Structures are given as C-alpha cells and as structure tokens.
Amino acid sequence: NSNAAGQFATATGAGSIAVGESATATGRASNAAGTYATATGADSMASGEEATATGQGSQAIGDKATATGRRANATGEKATATGWNANAIGEEATATGSNSQAEGRRATATGQFARALGGNATATGQFSTASGENATALGQQSAAYGEYATAVGQGSVATGATASAFGQNANATGVGATALGQNAQATANNATAVGAGANTAGYANATAIGAGATNTAANQMMFGGVTTTYAAPGITSAASHAAQSGPTNFVTSDGGGHLATSNYGPDNIAGLSGAVNSLGMNVASIWQSVGNLQRSVRRGYEGSAVAIANTAPTISRDARFGVSAKWGNFRGENAFGAMAQFRVNPNVVLNGSLAVGMRYGGVGGGVGGLYEW
C-alpha cells in the first residue's frame, strides 16, 4: 500500500511513500521525503527540500539534489547526477554520463566513466579522471592527479600539484611540471617540455623546447634536436647592442651543442689586431733593413769589381805612353775601368786609373808610380 503524509503529498505505487508538503512518490517502493521532493521510478528515493530522483533505483539526498537515470545518485545540497549509475556526492557536485562520478564540493564529471574527485575538480571526457582539489582533466582518457593539476587533450596525464599537460598523450609528472605538445614528456619536479615529443628525460628543473628536444642533465635548457636550425633576427638590432654593457665574449659550442662563452671577446680581438698590425709594421721595417743590407752587400761586391777594373799591367820599357781598359766582375756585380801610364825615364813610370760600377754607379780611381832598376 502507498502512503502520503503532508499537504498535497502524493504516493503512487505499491509501497510508495511521500512525506512532506507537495511531496510526490511515483513507482513501486518509491520514497519522497521533503517539501516538493519528487521520486519517480521503482525504488527511487528523494530526500530533501525540492530533491528530485528520476529513474529506477535513483537517489537524490539533499536540498535541491537531482538524480536522473537508473541508479543515479546525487548526495548533497544541489548535487546533480545524470545518467545510468551516475554518482554525484558533495555540495553542488555534478556527474553527467553513465557511470560518471563526482565527489567533492562543486566537483564536476562529464562523460562516460568520467571521475572528478575533490573540491572543484573537473573531469570532462570519456574515461577522464581529475583527482585533487581544483584538478582539471579535459579530453578522452585524460587524467589529472594533484591539487591544481591540469590535463588537456586525449590521453594527456598531469601528476603532481600544479602539474600541467596540454596535448594528445602529453605527460607532466612532478610538482610544477609542464608538458605542452603531442607526446611531450615533462617527468620531474619543475620540468618543462614544449613541442611534439619534447622530453625532459626525468631531469628536475630541466626545459626541453622544440620537436624531439631531449634533456641530458638537470637544470638544463635544451633547444631542438640535431636537425634543428636556429634564427634570432633581433640579435643584430641596435636595441640588442644597446642592451649590452661591459665586456662582451664569444659564444662557443662543443659537439653536443653545449653552449658557453669564451674567455676572450671582440675587445681582445681588436687588441690582438692592433698587435698584429704593429708586428706587421715591425716586419716591414725588418724587411726594409734586410733590403738595405742586401743593397749594401751588393755595393760592396760592386766595389770589389771596381777595384779589379782599376788594375792593368805595366807598360814595357820600350814604350813611352800606354792606355788600357778592363772589365771587372765580382759575385755578379760588374765594373768598367781605364788606366793611363807614362814613362818618365827608363826607371820611373807614372799611372792613373778610373773605374765605374755598372749597377749602382760606384766610382773608384787611383794614381801611382813605379820605380824599377
């Protein structure tokens, strides 16, 4: 037998019970308890002011709680469960979709088998899971575990307080970890991976930027991979130069792409350039000195040739006067000379000679006499 107690209360169905003003219970063993409470469906139960349970075995417990669907359960003030076996537990918790589950104040689960566990947790998408205060999972099979953890994208996973994963199969594991891009992997505390397939490889405080970039050490920033090229148009701007202060050094790289700065820079090169220029001037001066020395040596050779050209045999006793000419050569230098001889008497001969070098014009001469008996 049905039982209705309260002004305008209505109970319809074997074993149904409606208790409260305008309470309504419809269906076998349905139960509505509370002002304007409504239970519709066999074994349904609505308990609380304006609570509503619709569907076989559905249950709404709490003021303005709403459960819609077979075995749907909404427990808590303004809790809402919609879908077969949907379960919303907590003030203003909302579960939408078959087997969805929202537990915690204002937790929201939307999608088949979606699970939001924790205050303000939000899970949206089939098999999505958000576990932790203010955790958010958006996308099929996405998962966020930890306070303020966020996973957005199919198969994305964020594990750890404030961890964030954005992109299909992106994975951020660690406190403060961030993964952005398809298959990006940030797998340590405060690690950051940006780009498709970027991977911090388990190193803490590491940052990998660019498709396929992979860290090799903690506290490292890795940009791209072995096929990556780099461009920074602003590096040549006047503003960039103006932003620099103090000594500047050159950037160096080893075979693994590890960057550092040299112990020297443009100022050192400028100083070295000055030293090289000074050395060049010194070398030029040395070469000039060498040239002068070479000329002096050649002049000496020419002097030897002049000396040779200044010699001549003595005239015979029968001759009164004689003139001779001679070509002299010494180590490649040449001279031409002439000599005049005069016999004063049978025993005395006077002579004079003059010779000229053919390259440098060196002149040599002499006078002399011969006494014979």
PLM region spans:
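Small/polar residue-rich beta-strand/coil "junction" motifs that cap repeat-based extracellular fibers
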Residues: 9-15, 21, 26-28, 35-43, ...
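Alpha-helical heptad-repeat coiled-coil segments that mediate oligomerization/polymerization in large
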Residues: 18, 32, 60, 74, ...
